[in-house]
């Protein structure tokens, strides 16, 4: 009985830690608002998949159709989150952010770095939130590891791109 209670407690801790990820960031409302809309693709990778050779501990992405209201909404909240933090890279065209990689600091535990990736194409907007135990200088190498990660679904190999 004690073993079952201990396992239940551990499971609840893991669930609550995942639920708290990105709660303090403004960009969270974008995932909540647009993540379940028709045509949007929301992906969250579990830690058991991410632990295969990567230091990324949490991954959540949203791909949604692009329109002026969504773009304005995303950029306003993104500016609030990256204020006084590190811009790892940013590409602007005609004064408009087309893509960006941002380090938004450590999470509440103070151990894990948080990152937001943003890409704006004419037909879609992509936002990625991730956490990991690595400095901003190693983000590119961690993303390459993630890109090479294979997910097996119904005995088929799907490569993340």
Predicted features, each with a name:
Residues 40, 46, 83, 96-97, ...:
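Extracytoplasmic
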Residues 132-161:
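C-terminal partner/receptor-binding element of secreted or periplasmic proteins
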Residues 79-82, 86, 125, 151-153, ...:
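Amphipathic, non-transmembrane alpha-helical stretches in extra-cytosolic proteins
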Residues 66-110:
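Mid-chain, structured segments of secreted extracytoplasmic proteins
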Residues 56-61, 99-100, 112-115, 123-125:
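Short, surface-exposed beta-edge/turn micro-motifs
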Residues 105-139:
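A short, solvent-exposed beta-edge/loop patch
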Residues 1-27:
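Bacterial Sec-dependent N-terminal signal peptides
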Residues 24-78:
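Early exported N-terminus immediately downstream of N-terminal targeting peptides
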